[in-house]
Curated annotation (Swiss-Prot):
Name of the protein in question: Phosphoribosylaminoimidazole-succinocarboxamide synthase
GO BP: 'de novo' IMP biosynthetic process; cobalamin biosynthetic process
Record organism: Clostridium beijerinckii (strain ATCC 51743 / NCIMB 8052) (Clostridium acetobutylicum)
MF annotations from Gene Ontology: ATP binding; phosphoribosylaminoimidazolesuccinocarboxamide synthase activity
Enzyme class: ligase
EC number(s) stated in the UniProt entry for this protein: 6.3.2.6
InterPro entries, A to Z: SAICAR_synt/ADE2_N, SAICAR_synt_PurC, SAICAR_synth, SAICAR_synthetase, SAICAR_synthetase_CS
Family: Belongs to the SAICAR synthetase family.
Catalyzed reactions: 5-amino-1-(5-phospho-D-ribosyl)imidazole-4-carboxylate + L-aspartate + ATP = (2S)-2-[5-amino-1-(5-phospho-beta-D-ribosyl)imidazole-4-carboxamido]succinate + ADP + phosphate + 2 H(+)
Pfam families: SAICAR_synt
Alphabetic keyword roster: ATP-binding, Ligase, Nucleotide-binding, Purine biosynthesis
Pathway where it operates: Purine metabolism; IMP biosynthesis via de novo pathway; 5-amino-1-(5-phospho-D-ribosyl)imidazole-4-carboxamide from 5-amino-1-(5-phospho-D-ribosyl)imidazole-4-carboxylate: step 1/2
């Protein structure tokens, strides 16, 4: 397997072509951003830790019956993945009110929601990834109602699986976002990453934040939080 030209560079990753048309190499960077790119910085070894965390979690999800783009971890910063067409939507899963949802709805951060809430955002940095509903998503041609049902069903399975995994490690999964891709045959798979960049993790005993909020909110010990998540899920 040969690494070829870079196809795309995002805020946290680079995507490279390979000598196989249906496979790509994903490289994890140390760059950190928040507030739709308004705050920028670097977290030492973040790419190494997010690659490791995502690899572990995607393998767990595959075993639980969730199809993903992940094939294998290649080295500290790279993984081999199926080449997919990204659905231009983010599904945000909220088990507990925090962050923008708490602010938007006037809820105290940490409020336990009566049901898990799914939110949908349109992936467009220039627009600030606006929240939309299912009808917007279908109306603008981003997806279909049939595809959305598959995505929501997969998201529910991902949430149930990850909550159980992190509960065993004394961590509450507060919220997270996921992205999906279409394989060449139209199959929907989980794509992107699952890491402290894309999730809120709170220690179940102390309430300590173990995620990118430490960077967003200048709480300090950012790298330590990523290290702690990797340590707990690697037991």
């Amino acid at each position: 397997m040969e690494k070829l030209e870079m196809l795309y560079e995002g805020k946290a990753k680079k995507i490279y072509a390979t000598d196989k048309a249906d496979e790509v190499i994903v490289y994890y960077k140390d760059d950190a951003t928040a507030f739709n790119g308004e705050k920028k910085g670097q977290i030492e070894d973040k790419g190494i830790m997010n690659n490791a965390i995502t690899s572990v979690l995607f393998e767990i999800l595959e075993k639980a019956g969730v199809k993903t783009h992940f094939i294998e971890k290649l080295n500290d910063r790279e993984q081999l993945c199926k080449k997919v067409e990204i659905v231009p939507l983010e599904v945000i899963v909220r088990n507990v009110a925090a962050g923008s949802m708490a602010k938007r709805l006037g809820l105290e951060e940490g409020f336990k929601l009566k049901t898990t809430v799914f939110e949908l955002s349109y992936k467009d940095d220039s627009l600030g990834d606006p929240l939309i509903n299912d009808y917007h998503a279908v109306g603008i041609g981003a997806t279909t109602f049939e595809e959305l049902k598959v995505i929501y069903d997969m998201t529910a399975k991902i949430n149930d699986t990850l909550k159980a995994v992190f509960k065993e490690q004394n961590i509450n999964l507060i919220d997270f976002k996921v992205e999906f891709g279409r394989c060449a045959d139209g199959t929907i798979v989980l794509a992107d990453e699952i890491s402290p960049d894309t999730c809120r993790f709170w220690d179940a005993t102390t309430g300590e934040k173990l995620d990118k909020d430490r960077f967003r909110r200048d709480l300090g010990n950012v790298k330590d939080a990523y290290v702690e998540i990797l340590k707990r899920i690697s037991k």
